[in-house]
């Protein structure tokens, strides 16, 4: 079992239940899913860019990414409907907890000039969004094997109803927020 799942059951759940005065354990917010998205606008010109990004994302997430396609044609961006423009992975259950643990304890300390993540990136419903500028912070990515530095968006979806509940949940996992 993932260690963060054990931490959630033994430490985070009782702490949140006491802090927010929940009557039942099922009311305590929990993680639903983590979505990792790589938007690749330049993939329309070269298919190898998309393949390399998929390979990187598969190494990071431990799961095969799905290709995202353009919903509408946009002349300004020089894309047509149905063209591949990125890739994403949705993590749930054990893989989600394992990724979050690696992200919190291994990857985020490797970010240059890291002082913590902004607590303002909650969406009003307890979900947290953050962007990463380079995939090199993950130990699975070898610096010599990448063709270019790519960023990604990470969305942490929770069952929390408010931002305060969502922040308390992520802090319970040891998520590094700026003070």
UniProtKB/Swiss-Prot annotation:
GO terms for biological process: translation. It comes from the Bacteria. Keywords: Ribonucleoprotein, Ribosomal protein, RNA-binding, rRNA-binding, tRNA-binding. The keyword DNA-binding does not apply. The keyword Ribonucleoprotein applies. One of its GO terms (molecular function) is rRNA binding. InterPro entries: Ribosomal_uL5 (IPR002132), Ribosomal_uL5_bac-type (IPR020930), Ribosomal_uL5_C (IPR031309), Ribosomal_uL5_CS (IPR020929), Ribosomal_uL5_dom_sf (IPR022803), Ribosomal_uL5_N (IPR031310). Belongs to the universal ribosomal protein uL5 family. Part of the 50S ribosomal subunit; part of the 5S rRNA/L5/L18/L25 subcomplex. Contacts the 5S rRNA and the P site tRNA. Forms a bridge to the 30S subunit in the 70S ribosome. This is Large ribosomal subunit protein uL5.
């Amino acid at each position: 079992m993932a260690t963060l799942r054990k931490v959630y059951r033994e430490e985070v759940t009782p702490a949140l239940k006491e802090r927010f005065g929940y009557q039942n354990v099922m009311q305590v917010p929990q993680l639903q899913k983590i979505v990792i998205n790589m938007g690749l606008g330049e993939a329309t010109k070269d298919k190898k860019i998309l393949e390399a990004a998929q390979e990187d994302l598969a190494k990071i997430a431990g799961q095969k990414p799905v290709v995202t396609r353009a919903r509408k044609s946009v002349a300004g961006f020089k894309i047509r409907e149905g063209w591949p423009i990125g890739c994403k992975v949705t993590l749930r259950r054990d893989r989600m907890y394992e990724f979050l643990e690696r992200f919190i304890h291994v990857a985020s300390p490797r970010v240059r000039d890291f002082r913590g993540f902004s607590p303002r990136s909650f969406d009003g419903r307890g979900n947290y969004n953050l962007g990463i500028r380079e995939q090199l912070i993950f130990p699975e990515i070898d610096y010599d094997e990448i063709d270019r530095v790519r960023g990604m968006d990470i969305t942490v979806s929770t069952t929390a109803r408010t931002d305060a509940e969502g922040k308390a949940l992520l802090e319970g996992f040891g998520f590094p927020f700026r003070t």
